[in-house]
């Protein structure tokens, strides 16, 4: 079991129960899934870019990504419905906890000029979304084999009912919010 998951069960549940005065442990918010998304708009012209992005995503997450396709045709972007334009991975269970641990303790501190992540990126229902500008902050990515620097979106879906509860849950994991 991941260290962060043990920490959640032993400390965070008790801490949040006390802070929000929950009557049952099942009311305590928990992280349900983490979704990683990488949009590769340039893949229209060169399919190799999407394959490289998918292999980077697989290296970061530890599981094979799903290739996302365009939902509708947009002439301005020169895409047709069904064109492959990105990839995504949904992490749950053990892989999710391990990824969150690596994100908080290794990857985010490696971002250049890192001052913390915005505390305003909650969606109103306790879910948190953030963007990473370069995939090379993850130690699994070999810098010499990267064809181009790509960013990715990370969404942390929680069972929290409000932003305040979601923020308290992530703060309990020492998530580096900007002061």
Curated annotation (Swiss-Prot):
GO molecular function, one term: rRNA binding
Coiled-coil stretches noted in the UniProt entry, renumbered to this chain: none
Cell membrane listed as a keyword: no
Keywords: Ribonucleoprotein, Ribosomal protein, RNA-binding, rRNA-binding, tRNA-binding
This protein's record includes keyword RNA-binding: yes
GO biological process terms held by the UniProt record: translation
CC annotations in GO: ribonucleoprotein complex; ribosome
InterPro entries, alphabetized: Ribosomal_uL5, Ribosomal_uL5_bac-type, Ribosomal_uL5_C, Ribosomal_uL5_CS, Ribosomal_uL5_dom_sf, Ribosomal_uL5_N
Source species, domain of life: Bacteria
Family annotation (Pfam families): Ribosomal_L5, Ribosomal_L5_C
Subunit structure of this chain's protein: Part of the 50S ribosomal subunit; part of the 5S rRNA/L5/L18/L25 subcomplex. Contacts the 5S rRNA and the P site tRNA. Forms a bridge to the 30S subunit in the 70S ribosome.
Name the UniProt record assigns to this protein: Large ribosomal subunit protein uL5
Protein's gene: rplE
């Amino acid at each position: 079991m991941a260290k962060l998951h043990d920490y959640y069960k032993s400390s965070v549940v008790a801490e949040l129960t006390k802070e929000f005065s929950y009557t049952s442990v099942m009311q305590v918010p928990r992280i349900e899934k983490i979704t990683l998304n990488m949009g590769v708009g340039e893949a229209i012209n060169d399919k190799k870019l999407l394959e490289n992005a998918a292999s980077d995503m697989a290296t970061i997450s530890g599981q094979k990504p799903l290739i996302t396709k365009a939902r509708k045709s947009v002439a301005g972007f020169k895409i047709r419905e069904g064109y492959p334009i990105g990839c995504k991975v949904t992490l749950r269970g053990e892989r999710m906890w391990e990824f969150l641990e690596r994100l908080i303790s290794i990857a985010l501190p490696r971002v250049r000029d890192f001052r913390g992540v915005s505390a305003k990126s909650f969606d109103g229902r306790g879910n948190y979304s953030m963007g990473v500008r370069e995939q090379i902050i993850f130690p699994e990515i070999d810098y010499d084999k990267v064809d181009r620097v790509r960013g990715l979106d990370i969404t942390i879906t929680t069972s929290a009912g409000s932003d305040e509860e979601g923020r308290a849950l992530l703060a309990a994991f020492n998530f580096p919010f900007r002061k």
